[in-house]
C-alpha cells in the first residue's frame, strides 16, 4: 500500500492537472501582508518600529493591493523571543505604543477598507506572566494552568519525567524549587506551556480573543498550534537516529509532543469565539506539520492553515517538476471547501531572495499571486529585500545567541528581520535615527521602495501588476490547469469560458528552452505578453508551438479576448 501511495504522489508531479469548475471558496483571491512591527516603520526616532509608524504607512498596503495585514506580537513581553513570550495578553508593549494607538490603527485601517488581525500565541506565556507567577506559588486556580511534574528518580537522582527536547534544544523540562517540580516548555525555558487539559485555561484564552475582537480586530494568525497539547501519559519519545546529542531538537521523534489529536478540538473552541461576532472573523493557522495533519485544520474552523510548501518543499536547487508537485499536492489534498494559500516567506526563514536568488524569487512571487486563493507576503519581500549580515556582537535573536558564536549564523533569524527599506535616506527611511535595533541592509541605496516605484521592471512594480490582475472579478472566475511543458518548464493556466485565459510559463533551469503551449487545450495561437522578466519589449507571440523561454526566464501571456489585464 505504501508503494502505491508513493507512486501516486510522484505521479502528481508529472501529469496534467486541472481544477474546474472553480468552487466559490477558491475565488477568495486575497492578499495578506505580515508586518513585523519592530522593523516596519519607526515614528519616534528610537530605532524601533511602532504602531504609529504602521499607521503612517497604510497607503503602502493600498498601493500594493493588500486586503488584510497581521501584526506580529505587540504585547507586553520580556522579549526573550521578541514578543512570542507574552506577559500580558490584553495590553501593548510600551516600545510599540499604547492600546489607544492600537485602537487608532484599527480605525484607520478600517477607514481605508483594510482588515487587521493580531498574532495570537496560545501555546505558552512568558514566565513573567501573572498566571505563571501564581502557579509557581501553587495558588488555585493557577496551580494547574501549566504542566507540572515531580519528575522521576533514577539512580537516586531526580531527573525530568521524559526525554522530551525543546524546539530550541535542551530538555523541554525545567525545575523550579518553589514548586518542587518540573514545568514543561516546548520552546525557551522562559516560555512555559499552558495546560489546555484544564478547561479554565481554555476559557481564559477564549476571553483573550473576545477582548481583541471587541476592539475591532478582524481575527488572528494563531502561532505554533501543533505544540498546544501533549500526551499526558508522559512517555519517552523514540529516538530519531539523526543525532546522538540529546540536547538537539531532532534527537527525538515528536510523537507525544506534536500533532496530538486534542489540538484540533482547541482550534474548534477558538473558532466558536470568532463565530460569536456578527461580522466575519478570520483565523489563520501556523502549523509546521505533514500535509494530512495540516489539511485537518480546515475541518476545525481555520480559514486556512498556512501552506509552507515554498518554504519546506523546495529550494534553490529544485527543478520545475518540484514546483508543479507543490501546487498539485495542495490543490489535490485540500478539502473541497478549503481556501488555498501560498506563503513564500515569514519571520522565521531566510528571505525569499536569499533562499532562491532574485529571478526564482520573482517566479515564486508570481505563482503566489496568480494561483487561486490567498497570497501571503512577508514585509519587504514585495521589493525583493535580501538577508542582512549581522555580526555575532549585534545578534539579537535568542535562537542565534543560544547557538554560540561559531554556529549563530546558521540559527539566527535576525538577517530576515531588518528594517524595511523605504528610500535612500538615513536608515533607509525607516527611522530618523542612524542607530536602529538591527542594522539596515547596506544595499538600501538601490533596493528601496522609492527607487523601485520609478523602475517599471522592479520587483515592486511586478508585484503591483500581478496584484491588480488578481483583483479582477473575471480573473477570479478562472479555472486552474498545471502542465510540464518539458523537463525544465512548469506552466499553469487560469482559463474562463467567456472572459479569456492566462498562461504562466516558468523556466526554473539555467538554460534557454523552447516549448509548445498546445499542451494546454484550445490555447490561442496568438497571445498578448502581459509580463516578461527579461524582455519587456515583446508585446505578443504569434506562434504558440515554438516559444522561447530564457534561462531562469518567465512570462505571463493573456488571450486577446481577456477581460482582465491592461494593454
From Swiss-Prot:
Glycosylated residues (UniProt): 88, 123, 247, 290, 313, 319, 499, 507
Catalyzed reactions per annotation: Hydrolysis of terminal, non-reducing (1->4)-linked alpha-D-glucose residues with release of alpha-D-glucose
Extent of the signal sequence: 1-17
Entry-linked SMART domains: Aamy
Tissue spec. comment: Expressed specifically in the hypopharyngeal glands of worker bees. Also found in the brain of worker bees (at protein level).
GO BP term, pick one: carbohydrate metabolic process
Record keywords, A-Z: Glycoprotein, Glycosidase, Hydrolase, Signal
Assigned EC number: 3.2.1.20
Presence of keyword Hydrolase: yes
Domain of life, per lineage: Eukaryota
Gene3D superfamilies: Glycosidases, Oligo-1,6-glucosidase, Domain 2
InterPro entries: Glyco_hydro_13_cat_dom, Glycoside_hydrolase_SF, O16G_dom_2
Positions annotated as active site in the UniProt record: 223, 286
Complexes and interactors: Monomer.
Name of the protein: Alpha-glucosidase
Organism (species): Apis mellifera (Honeybee)
